[in-house]
A protein has these predicted regions:
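Pre-Walker A-like glycine/lysine-rich segment at the N-terminus of P-loop NTPase domains
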Residues: 1-54, 183
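Short glycine-/polar-rich loops that comprise or flank the Walker A/P-loop
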Residues: 29, 85-91, 119-123, 154-158, ...
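Short hinge/gating elements
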Residues: 30-31, 130-133, 164-170
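Conserved P-loop NTP-binding catalytic core
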Residues: 35, 46-106
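Conserved NTP-handling cores and scaffolds of large molecular machines
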Residues: 38, 49, 53-57, 151-155, ...
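Charged, alpha-helix-enriched surfaces in structured cytosolic catalytic cores
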Residues: 40, 44, 86, 138-145, ...
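Glycine-rich phosphate-binding loops of NTPases
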Residues: 60-70, 75-76, 101-159, 172-182
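Extended, Lys/Glu-rich alpha-helical coiled-coil stalks
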Residues: 164-230
């Protein structure tokens, strides 16, 4: 079942100053497009997903991915760092998958001590909403299973999380093998191949069973005919 994102929210994350409600983007049914001028937060929006999924963020200055744990100070809102002694930097995503709703949040607490800004380690919070009950997922292995298999599966991430400069690396048209792999991943060809193999196997078994039953019926009919002629 596909993942359907319901909302994405930020809290004091880069230029998204303020709480989650102030920086929440509710998605509608169908394709949702995030459009903005330069330096208005599109790359930071992207970094929110990267932080959740891979604990990395894209540094536009060095034009390279950085470990998020080493970039937390830079990830914090500049306005929050100036105006608040205590604040939280976080990203929250609400999504549905196979009839179950999930809320995933990653955050770090910031504080100023003797004029020096410090922060806690980043933390993950996942809640499953099902049958009118909210169930916190506390086990780290279960959390990673939801992130890597339910939210955005690992195999789809190279195609689901793209920046412009990534397109040339995504599909190598000069390589038949690379192109085949891309098509296989996006279209689920391997799944269809598996279904075809199962269907062929079942067809062979059905044909063999039919021939066996037909042979038995033919033998029985001959026996009945001989009995009638006696």
């Amino acid at each position: 079942m596909a993942t359907i994102i319901r909302s994405v929210a930020f809290q004091n994350f880069y230029n998204y100053y303020g709480n989650y409600e102030h920086n929440r983007y509710d998605f509608t049914t169908g394709i949702n497009i995030v459009n903005a001028d330069n330096n208005m937060g599109k790359s930071k929006f992207y970094n929110g997903f990267m932080w959740l999924l891979d604990n990395r963020v894209y540094d536009s200055d060095s034009k390279a991915f950085k470990d998020a744990d080493e970039s937390l100070i830079k990830m914090a809102s500049g306005k929050a760092k100036v105006e608040e002694n205590k604040f939280t930097v976080g990203v929250r995503v609400v999504f549905d998958n196979d009839g179950v709703s999930y809320t995933i949040e990653k955050y770090a607490d910031f504080f100023t001590t003797n004029g020096v800004l410090g922060h806690s380690e980043s933390k993950m919070k996942i809640i499953r909403h099902e049958n009118n009950a909210d169930t916190p997922i506390l086990d780290k292995d279960q959390q990673m299973n939801i992130i890597n298999r339910v939210f955005i599966p690992l195999a789809l991430r190279p195609y689901a999380l793209l920046q412009g400069e990534s397109m040339d690396r995504l599909v190598d048209l000069s390589s038949k093998q690379a192109l085949s792999k891309t098509i296989d991943t996006l279209a689920g060809i391997s799944v269809l191949k598996g279904i075809c193999e199962i269907a062929k196997s079942m067809a062979k078994k059905a044909e063999a069973l039919y021939k066996h039953i037909d042979s038995v019926n033919s033998s029985n009919n001959k026996a009945k005919l001989l009995d009638t002629q006696k």
